[in-house]
């Protein structure tokens, strides 16, 4: 992975630090990208690297993820992450020049980006990959139940590994990760683990904090859905295959489908940017060219 052309450490309200990295073409349209719960922005390199020749790509991790130091669990919640987002945008503009920002978010960061936009209109458009806003998969279980299940899984997850290779091998045995190329599973392990005290490796995002985010998710996603008509910028949602068992389904209301400019990738799961980076990059460019770069 290439070194960023610039890095700015953003000091947010409670003393936490967010490392924002700049890649790509500084003269191009500006993309601001973040990641899903428990993951890291560097993990999405197979996707955003395809946009780097044309776009000014600014990436950042959520607090307690990726490049950022761990924070106390009590400060780890969606309202605080929304405030972090706002501070990140302010720093990007002040350090690297003021120009329109196009948000590119996945999973939990889509909810944060949408909540950010409702509070303050910092984005000129939002490209959203597989946010869960109403029902999961075919609707056989509610979003609330799914969030609770994900929280339980996070708390039960193995937390210590001898090496990143051990985690990468375990990922290869899990069906949800089987659609990723082996090198992407390896990248996932490298970007989500850090050396542990006493040897071995542990997750950069503590499992308890990941679980807590899932528990916050439901309430905020419902709030976003109820305010869908408040958005006055172009929106694009690309979901996983609705039959995959974990996919964005905005509702059965055709007006909601139209508002989100909804599309999906057949045969892909929640991790579609990691499974089909080329298709996701093409859809990103197509959306921006159609709505804001024409």
PLM region spans:
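Alpha/beta-hydrolase fold catalytic core
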Residues: 1-34, 54-56, 93-97, 261, ...
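Active-site loop/oxyanion-hole signature of alpha/beta-hydrolase fold enzymes
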Residues: 13, 62-104, 282
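Conserved HGGG/HGGXW glycine-rich cap/lid loop of the alpha/beta-hydrolase fold
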Residues: 21-70
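Conserved hydrolase catalytic core segment
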Residues: 98-141
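Flexible "cap/lid" loop of the alpha/beta hydrolase fold
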Residues: 126-164
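Conserved alpha/beta-hydrolase catalytic His-Asp/Glu region
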Residues: 158-213
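Conserved serine/cysteine hydrolase catalytic core
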Residues: 194-255
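Catalytic histidine-centered segment of alpha/beta-hydrolase-like enzymes
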Residues: 268-277
